[in-house]
């Protein structure tokens, strides 16, 4: 698992990843969640921030600090380092450092979906086990219905309404788990591109796992968004 924590926080006005979220730095939520998933062989944080670097070190979490300007370079740096530590890595999940409402069970479901596809590539429509797939399949970007042995698994949220007629809105986002078949593409992304570039090249292998709540996909760009997410946790 690689945690991307290189955002400059320009809209936030300061280092958002170290901003207080229920008494701890914002990034702590993702560190805590990813640390509770036993399916990960290792974790690595990639950041530009000395504060984030020092905080991760204080927790014993592997961290790389860099001054690279572009997303593709930071992603390449992280994946290269992870492959040096684990040359036989079968896949890698990329998470964002500013998604504080991400849940451990959701990460586990992403990993298990990946493993299902690796073991049985014809394992079909359990992507939406609790939803009306007949509606959903017409609304999401579509794969062939058959996961190949080199899957990409992406988190999405689905919101359904019953009136005046059934409808659904979907959002796709992070985390994303890539099979090692796509590592070379991730290591050679176009300038300023991220992992979504690889998704667009292989839409037929992407599998979707639904978030337990839509807010899991929300990241933080402004102090107002941080406050809103804090309030959501308080309500829950």
Regions from the PLM with identified roles:
Residues 1, 184, 188-236:
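Conserved alpha/beta core of the MobA/IspD/sugar-nucleotide pyrophosphorylase nucleotidyltransferase superfamily
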Residues 1-50:
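N-terminal glycine-rich phosphate-binding loop and ensuing alpha1 helix
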Residues 20, 101, 176-177, 208, ...:
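Short aromatic/basic micro-patch
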Residues 39, 58-60, 202:
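Short, structured coil segments at secondary-structure junctions
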Residues 51-57:
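Acidic helix N-cap motif at the loop->helix transition within catalytic regions
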Residues 59-73:
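Conserved donor nucleotide-binding strand/loop of the catalytic core
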Residues 69-122, 134-137, 141, 148-188:
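Conserved beta-loop-beta/alpha segment of the NTase-like Rossmann-fold superfamily
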């Amino acid at each position: 698992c690689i945690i991307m924590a290189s955002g400059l926080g320009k809209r936030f006005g300061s280092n958002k990843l170290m901003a207080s979220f229920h008494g701890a730095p914002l990034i702590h939520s993702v560190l805590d969640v990813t640390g509770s998933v036993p399916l990960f062989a290792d974790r690595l944080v990639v950041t530009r921030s000395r504060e984030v670097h020092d905080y991760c070190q204080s927790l014993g979490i592997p961290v790389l600090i860099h001054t690279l300007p572009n997303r593709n370079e930071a992603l390449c740096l992280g994946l290269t380092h992870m492959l040096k530590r684990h040359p036989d890595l079968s896949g890698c999940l990329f998470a964002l450092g500013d998604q504080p409402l991400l849940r451990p069970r959701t990460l586990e479901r992403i990993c298990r979906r990946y493993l299902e596809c690796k073991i049985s590539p014809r394992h079909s429509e359990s992507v939406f086990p609790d939803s009306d797939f007949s509606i959903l399949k017409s609304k999401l970007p579509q794969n062939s219905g058959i996961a190949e042995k080199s899957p990409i698994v992406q988190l999405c949220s689905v919101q359904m309404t019953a009136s005046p007629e059934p409808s659904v809105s979907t959002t796709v986002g992070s985390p994303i788990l890539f099979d090692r078949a796509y590592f070379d593409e991730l290591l050679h992304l176009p300038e300023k591109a991220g992992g979504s570039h690889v998704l667009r090249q292989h839409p037929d292998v992407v599998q979707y796992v639904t978030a337990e709540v839509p807010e899991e996909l929300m990241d933080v760009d402004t102090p107002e968004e941080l406050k809103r997410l804090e309030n959501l946790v308080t309500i829950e």
